[in-house]
Amino acid sequence: MKQILPIDVANIKELLMINAFDEPVTLNDLLFACFIIERLSRRIHRSNLYVVTNIKTEGITYLLEFATTLHSQNFNQTCDEMILEYKLKNGKIVKPEKPSDLLIGNVYSELIWKVQQEDLVQTVIDVYNSPICKVIDNYKTLAYLDPTPVLVNAYYNKRY
């Protein structure tokens, strides 16, 4: 018979990322952050990797910590503020309107949520730097439609 150990709430807090309002960061907060990363990449015609690399840990942390309030703000305003704050430059990549930025944000958030270790922000950076992201971002491959377990497996194998 399995022994059930009491849960030490103080230690759980150390395992979770806590937002600016002293609440755990949720999957919805992560979805918002990934959606804004995708929307930014489309607005400035650059890859998601460019956005993640340039907003760095600080920008990703900001999106996750304030997602509960930022989602009430106009998304384009959030993007405009981040473009100015992190000096994001326009590029030449033109992404199609479909799949939507929300759908791609959902694909990334589900993948990140499943593979996260201790540091959620570092996991975001690691996933966007993974070789499989080039496959996911090539919409002709339709990889973004694959079930999350397939993407998780590809992430751990470092190839699609």
Question: How would you describe each model-predicted region?
Answer:
Residues 5-15, 68-101, 155:
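Long, compositionally biased
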